C-alpha cells in the first residue's frame, strides 16, 4: 500500500439487480458517517444490471435516503495487490429519520429472520457456495481446457487462488475452499457457516473481493449463471440449517424420513410449495433459466432429494469419520439460485417460505430418488413434482400468482423488483441466447 495514498472506505448496498453500489469516504469521514450514513436515492434501487433506470418505477426522480453503515459488516484486506487496501462496509438503507426503508433487501432479510424467531423460536445458520468463471481472454488463460477439479487447473492461474484465499481470510470471511471446478476456467468459493445475515454479507464480500483479485491478475471474474451459452453454468448454492433458542441444532432427527426434524421437514415443505413463486427472487436473470434445466446439475423441478445434485432442495450428507456426530453437520442445500439474485432477498424468500411451511404444519415433502424428467406426468403429479418456470418472465408471472409470496414483501419493493426485471427482459429482446449470455457474462 502506497504511503502517499489514503485508502477509501466504500459504504455500500446491494440492489435488486444484485449489483453492489455505494460511495467512498476517507477513514476520517467514514467515522463521522457511522451515525448519519451517506446520501442515497430511491431510484437507485431501480438500476438494472445494464446501467439503465427501469421506467416506470415507484420512485421517479424524487426522494432521499441514507445508507447507514454496519461496522459488523466491514470487509477489509490489503492483500489484493492494489495500491490501496480493499475496504467495504455494508449498510442498511434508511429514511432520513433513521427508520428502516421498506425496499431495502438487507432490512427484509432481517425482518424475515425476526419473524421466524418470533413464531418458532428458531434461527437460521447459512452459507453460500458461489461459482465463477475467469472469462476467456483473461491473462494467462489456457489455450485448451484443463482437467476439471485438477491441481493443474488450480495452479495454472497461480497465485490467483492463494491470493484470493488470503484476501478472504484477512477480510474475515472465513473461506473454507477456493477450488477449480468442473467448467473451463471455473472456480468455486465456500465459506464457514454462520448466522444468516452474516452469510449474505459474506456472499456480497466474496463477489467483490474476487473481482478485485481477478482484476489485479489481469483477468475478469464473472459470476453470471451462463457466461457463455456453450459453457457450464455458475450457481449459488445456499446451505441452511435451523438452530433452537439455545443455539443447538434443530434440523436433524435420525428417526424421521431423510433425517429431517419435524420443523425442518415443514420448513422444506414450505419452500417446495412456494418454489415456483420465489424462484424469480433466487434466480433473477434472463439466462438463469438456460441453466435451470434437466440434466444440468442445477434444478428444474419442485423436488426434495437426498444427496442428489439435480434436486432443488438437496439433503446433504454427514461424515462419521473419527466418530463425528451428524447433528451439527446436517443441512439442506437450496440449488435454484445464482448471482443475478440479491443474496438478502433470495435468503429472505427461502426463510419466508420455510416459515409458512412451519406455520401451516405441512408434512415433509416426499424424498424423490429418481429423475423427474423421465417420469410420467401422472407420477410427477403424485409426487408433487412441478417444472420450475422456464423463463424469467414466467418466473415473474408465477411470483405474481402466489398471494403468499406477494404478501411477504412490501409492495414498493416488489414493484421495483418487477420493474427492474421486466426492463432487463426488454433490453434482451431480439438477442439470441448466446448474445444474452455474453451480455450478462460481462456484467456479473
Model segments located where?
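Helical (often loop-to-helix) elements that flank the catalytic cores of nucleotide-handling enzymes
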Residues: 149-157, 198-214, 242-275
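Secondary-structure transition/capping motifs at alpha-helix termini
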Residues: 19, 118-121, 196, 200, ...
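Structured core elements
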Residues: 10-12, 24, 90, 133, ...
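Catalytic-core signal marking the mid-to-C-terminal active-site face
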Residues: 219-220, 245-444
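ATP/Mg2+-dependent ligation/transfer catalytic cores
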Residues: 1-180, 199-202, 345, 383-444
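Active-site-proximal beta-alpha loop/turn segments in soluble metabolic enzymes
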Residues: 140-151, 184-199, 228-233, 247-252
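Core alpha/beta catalytic barrel or barrel-like domain that forms the active/cofactor pocket
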Residues: 125-136, 171-191, 221-238, 278-286
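Accessory "access/gating" subregions that flank catalytic or transport cores
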Residues: 161-165, 169-175, 189-196, 207, ...
